[in-house]
Amino acid sequence: MTLLRRIILFSILLCIGLASCQEDIVSDNPTLRLSFSHDSLLFDTVFTTIGSSTRQMMIYNPNRNAILIDRVEMRGGKSFFINLDGENQIENMRDITLRGGDSLFLFVRTKIDPQSVNSPVFIEDTIVFYLNQTKQEIFLQAYGQNVEILRGSNGFLQCDKLSLTNEKPYLIYDTLVVTGNLSIQQGSTLYMHSGAMIYAYGNVIANGTIENPITIRGDRTDRLFDSVPYRVASGQWGGIFLVDAESMLPPRYEFDHVDIISGSVGLYALSENSVRRPKLSLTNSRIHNHAEYGLVLQNIDANVAN
């Protein structure tokens, strides 16, 4: 290589090196804005004391020059928690330089304090980004719901008999075993945690109405994808198992206006006695979106109709 070519090559490499060492130009132009993947986040029903899943969004700088984010603030209370690119202390979210064309991760979750009311509670807050004498906002909203938690020990909760009311929803964490009669009032909602099941060894009376149906579903209230809520995703909980305990009288099962959704098994009724069979009435009900079986009947006198 000739001396001239070496000088030219060295000059090019030197220019590249100097350019790479230059600091990003931080613009204070108030017309430059950040771009958000979402301008608001809505959390579907969040159970009080339990907390939500974590939602993610992106903060972009679509401009050529860097932008200095002076500080980030939460405008409202303390029901929402944020993590900005690994920093979860809001007081430390200041003097953040976001290079041109670069982005930041923002994670948001919420935990709602228990309320004295049983109906859903609406809460909201705002994340405020201050930059270049301007501000930009992301709106946060959530519905909180008080629930009655049914949780046992070693994964089981056993009851002699059980009456579930519609005063507030139930969150069933473990396998619920009812050795006597089980009744579920119209308008009741049962949220089943992952792996939770119901075993009923006595009579089961679950009579909803068209105005106040009974709902038995998984406890995920967020979304699998933006257009697909978790409530329709199968395999979220175990199933409902009706077992004949071989008592003097065969058990009686009544389900009317009941929606059973998103389990591994919907309704499984089993008897070993082919002579003294339990009776099942299943009317005006929906059993759908289950991973294995929707309805299984063995030695059951059944009336299934809509």
List PLM regions with ranges.
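Bacterial N-terminal signal peptides that target proteins for export
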Residues: M1-I8
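Asparagine-centered strand-capping/turn motif at beta-strand->loop junctions
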Residues: I59-N63
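Short acidic/proline- and small/hydrophobic-mixed sequence motifs that coincide with surface turns
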Residues: S52-S53, R64-I69
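Beta-strand/loop edge motif enriched in small/polar residues
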Residues: I25-S27, L34-T45, I50-S52, Q56, ...
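Short, solvent-exposed loop/linker segments at beta-strand-coil boundaries, enriched for Pro/Gly
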Residues: E73-N92
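C-terminal motif of bacterial Sec signal peptides marking the signal peptidase cleavage site
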Residues: L18-S20
